[in-house]
Amino acid sequence: MSQRKYFGTDGIRGHVGLSNINPEFVLKLGWAVGCVLANGARKKVVIGKDTRVSGYMLESALEAGLSAAGVDVALLGPMPTPGIAYLTQTLRANAGIVISASHNLFEDNGIKFFSADGGKLPDSVELAIEAQLEKQLQTVPSAKLGKATRINDAAGRYIEFCKSTIPSLSRLSNLKIVVDCANGATYHIAPNVFSELGADVVPIGIKPDGFNINQECGSTAPELLREKVIAVGADIGIGLDGDGDRVILVDSLGNLVDGDQIIYIIAKDRHQRGVLHGGVVGTLMSNYGLELAITSLGVPFQRSKVGDRYVLETLREKDWKIGGETSGHIVCLDKTTTGDGIVAALQVLSIMVKQNKALHELTAGIQLLPQTLVNLKTNNAALLASNPDVIQAVKNLEKHLNGEGRVLLRPSGTEPLLRVMVEGANASIVKQQAQMLCDDISQIDKKMTESLPST
């Protein structure tokens, strides 16, 4: 596959004004997308965004570029990423565009795309867009310019969809829920979803001002959520990120419930009901405790590369339905086409009601292993990861762990680092073993550097 110039694993992202996330580039990006999609026929694209102040500017730029290519635009306004994927399908659009930098702070923003079926754009389409970006922008004749309309009931449509993902007779009437919307795209949606299903909802992070998205709130900063759950005596806390595709939970005792535990709860329930349809997909960074808990049920477990894109790819390859990441990207392919924080939370709430169990009871079957991650500075990360002496050192440690732990080496894709991760039953021993392994690798790195010809 050709090397991408602009697209990363999840669209195009950067610091606003100091990267390609600027009005000039984004206008041309909209035009390029329009040209690739249109291919001579009238097409329609939906655009949604989170609550960053830069979203207004980027939305206008995209709209102008798409119009110049003769593509009609439907503006959704603030809308969670999975909501945009859903509405792309129901509005019969040819593509959906998300303006968001997910869990990042307001200074960043990004553009990512969904195809007509609500899935990620194929690599071939992304490469065609990049090729079009290299051409001179040409506006279609005035009679063929695209029009823009605003979908005023977009939030209501998505709220109804979310509610439809649990059994129609499910009621959350006996649950008190704190929901943290991260001052992001779910601020006007998530509280309504849960309250319309009967829950007593205490919402926080619902006052976006363009600058406070993900700021000391949401799934990446759950301290406020935890405090609120304890303070109001809630049954559960739900922490979403700025664009609503991640979720973490807090139980009534104040314990954090991460993506691995959420995957376990959902997968175990489906397995017990005979509707799991295959196995479960995690990533290279999923806790070994998840693998042990899933396989102990007699359910296959597969690891993908890190990133929800790769989780989705593996699920589709195997025709499985449930997967996700520790960070809270949870994919239920029998319900949605992408990670959806609200939908994942609803699955857990439905299980709590159906089994009449508290969240801490549902997590009792999975024991997360202590994990130590060390970032080892080196200019030889990739060489070290494949070095025979390093591989042997890893094997020796894995033998010592005796099937009750895991070792993972990952060269960083952006920094001169080798990430060394060790998991095991005892936290202090794991920390010690990780440091010993890093010391061994550092010695090998030193010898390797000395043997390399000087430049």
Swiss-Prot record:
Protein name, per record: Phosphoglucosamine mutase
Function: Catalyzes the conversion of glucosamine-6-phosphate to glucosamine-1-phosphate.
Textual note on the cofactor: Binds 1 Mg(2+) ion per subunit.
List of residues that carry Phosphoserine: 102
Enzyme Commission no: 5.4.2.10
Active site: 102
Gene Ontology cellular-component annotations: cytosol
Keywords annotated in UniProt: Isomerase, Magnesium, Metal-binding, Phosphoprotein
Species: Legionella pneumophila subsp. pneumophila (strain Philadelphia 1 / ATCC 33152 / DSM 7513)
Changes after translation: Activated by phosphorylation.
Cofactor: Mg(2+)
Superkingdom field: Bacteria
Entries under CDD domains matching the protein: GlmM
Presence of keyword Acyltransferase: no
InterPro entries: A-D-PHexomutase_a/b/a-I, A-D-PHexomutase_a/b/a-I/II/III, A-D-PHexomutase_a/b/a-II, A-D-PHexomutase_a/b/a-III, A-D-PHexomutase_C, A-D-PHexomutase_C_sf, Alpha-D-phosphohexomutase_SF, GlmM_bact
